[in-house]
Each structure stands twice: as C-alpha cells, then as structure tokens.
Amino acid sequence: MLKDMRRWFWLLLLAVICLAQDSVDPWAKNELMEPAALAAALHSAKPPVILCTAFSALYRSKRIPHALEAGPGSKPEGIALLKKAVADLPKDADIVLYCGCCPMVKCPNIRPAYHVLHELGFEHVRVLNIPSNMHEDWFGKGYPAEAGT
C-alpha cells in the first residue's frame, strides 16, 4: 500500500509541475494590459505602438487600428518581421503586443515576440490580455477594429 501511495504521489507531483510550466509567463502582471485600457489609449495624444504577432491571415482579416504586422512570433520569418517593425523605434517606446489566435496560455506567438523585444533592449513592453481569442475578447466586445487589406 505504501508503495502505491508513493507512486501516486510522484505522478501527482509530476502532473502539478507540468501544469505549472504551462502557466508560467515571462511577463509580470503589471505588464499585462487590459483591452479597455488599450481601447482608451488608442485615443490618447501618444498611443502605444501596437504589434500584432498573429499569423498573417488573422492580421489581414481584422485588427486593432494602427497595429503593425509583426508575426507570427512562432516562426523565424515572423521574428524577422517583428525586428523590422521595431528597427527604428527608440528603446523606451511604449509597445503593446497582441496575438489572439487562441487562448493566451497556449499561444505560440506572444512569448517568443516578448522575449525578442526584451533581448533587443526595449524597456516598455506590455502584452494585451486576451484570455480566449481576439473575436471574443476584443472584437466581440465592441472595441475599435479595422479591416485588413
């Protein structure tokens, strides 16, 4: 019986470790930006630079106004596009990243883009908090959008 309990303990511990790794994000909580805050910032005197790290088809279909295509962050060509998009920006630029292709905890694009921007020395990078997807968490809530090209 003790042997079975030990085995279950180790299996449970392994499962907890695996689940914890899925939920670890490289950004601090204060680096998450809520959709309502970004929607308000779009109308400010100095709106942030908005970078869409989603797949090109998503960017071209519908996006946040003035967002630049900078992805997909999971592909080398997307990282090259990201680097090109920020090449002329000052390191203290206010940058907001978003993807929204899927639930953020599973997103393949946002974390690589976040890491690259920090490696390039950008100091003010925030991530748009899109828990489910862009349709549900941004467009479906009536926040500003523009059609792609």
Show where each model-derived region lies.
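Rhodanese-like catalytic fold shared by cysteine-dependent sulfurtransferases
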Residues: 2, 20-32, 60-149
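Aromatic-Pro/Gly-enriched surface loop or interdomain linker
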Residues: 34, 55-56
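Short, flexible active-site loop motifs that bind/organize anionic cofactors or intermediates
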Residues: 10, 28, 49
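Hydrophobic h-region of N-terminal signal peptides that target proteins for export
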Residues: 12-21
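Short hydrophobic beta-strand that contains or immediately precedes a catalytic carboxylate
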Residues: 38, 49-54, 67-70
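Bacterial N-terminal signal peptides that target proteins for export
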Residues: 2-9
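Short active-site oxyanion
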Residues: 42-50, 66, 124
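A short, well-structured juxtamembrane/interface segment
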Residues: 29-43
